[in-house]
């Protein structure tokens, strides 16, 4: 995430952009589908505060988006050098700024083990399982909504 202030607006379609949505170019007459899906406020009027909402389309986006999938693969590659339990812990710290509880840790380890086994327990199957798990974490409301 680029935390610098100011500068030109960026296109939402620019996959290399790491700016906050405050810096997105917004066409008032035709709101981008991703912004509309995330219940973006009406662009033609002032909106000092947004109410948190979650829509079914948001969940489908996180499950089917090539962009989200690529971010999950990048995170998987970043965590690949550590043991499975530590991967789950680090994923929670990076995505949610907290440690997983015991149930979340066990669920993450169980999910990745079962997914890898279903894929033939090969190295590629294990890597795919971790990418799937991380993508699922990115679809949680806790990741999507800033508290």
Q: What name fits each language-model region?
A:
Residues 114, 121-124:
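Surface-exposed, polar/charged faces of alpha-helical domains
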Residues 91, 107-108, 125, 129:
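Amphipathic alpha-helical segments in structured regions that serve as interaction surfaces
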Residues 95, 116-119:
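Short amphipathic alpha-helical interaction patches enriched in hydrophobic/aromatic residues
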Residues 106-117:
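Amphipathic alpha-helical segments that form the core helices of the histone-fold
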Residues 133:
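Globin-like tetrapyrrole-binding proteins
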Residues 1-99, 137-147:
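An acidic, gly/pro-interrupted, aromatic-rich
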């Amino acid at each position: 995430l680029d935390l610098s202030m100011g500068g030109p607006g960026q296109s939402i379609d620019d996959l290399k952009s790491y700016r906050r949505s405050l810096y997105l170019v917004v066409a008032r007459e035709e709101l981008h589908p991703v912004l509309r899906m995330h219940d973006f406020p009406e662009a033609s009027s002032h909106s000092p505060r947004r109410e948190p909402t979650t829509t079914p389309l948001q969940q489908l986006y996180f499950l089917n988006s090539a962009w989200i999938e690529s971010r999950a693969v990048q995170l998987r590659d970043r965590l690949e050098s550590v043991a499975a339990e530590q991967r789950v812990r680090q994923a929670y710290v990076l995505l949610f700024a907290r440690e997983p509880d015991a149930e979340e840790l066990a669920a993450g380890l169980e999910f990745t083990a079962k997914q890898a086994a279903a894929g033939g327990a090969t190295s590629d199957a294990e890597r795919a399982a971790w990418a799937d798990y991380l993508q699922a974490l990115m679809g949680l409301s806790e990741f999507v909504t800033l508290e």
